[in-house]
């Protein structure tokens, strides 16, 4: 199974790291969505079965970003951070599953996902938090 991971962070994170090695920055989710589209389209020659966005832009911005993604790009999942949101359930926007696992080191998020590799999409999933002892 081929999995594509794409990272999205806020301009604030870039400014705080002051790292010249970071490539690209996004002022808004429209710019981020356009960049995700370019990355996904650049990998069209590879049979990508599953695409994950790892973000640090906040839960509501994750939802907003998902609404702007073209379903043809094949983004399946957003695992986010920044706002430290702990939703009771993962949410779906525009066919993209989204979750965060709260803040600190109290818990981690766990997805169990069945992928339909014939159609390159999520067949089923469960999401929950797992306490860290």
Identify the meaning behind each predicted range:
Residues 1-133:
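Acidic, metal/ion-coordinating pockets
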């Amino acid at each position: 199974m081929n999995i594509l991971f794409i990272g999205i962070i806020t301009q604030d994170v870039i400014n705080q790291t002051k790292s010249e090695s970071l490539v690209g920055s996004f002022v808004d989710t429209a710019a981020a969505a356009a960049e995700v589209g370019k990355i996904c389209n650049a990998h069209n020659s590879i049979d990508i079965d599953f695409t994950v966005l790892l973000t640090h832009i906040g839960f509501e911005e994750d939802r907003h970003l998902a609404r702007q993604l073209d379903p043809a790009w094949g983004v399946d999942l957003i695992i986010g951070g920044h706002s430290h949101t702990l939703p009771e359930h993962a949410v779906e926007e525009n066919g993209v599953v989204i979750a965060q696992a709260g803040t600190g080191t109290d818990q981690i998020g766990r997805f169990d996902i069945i992928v339909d590799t014939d159609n390159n999409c999520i067949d089923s999933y469960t999401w929950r938090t797992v306490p860290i002892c």
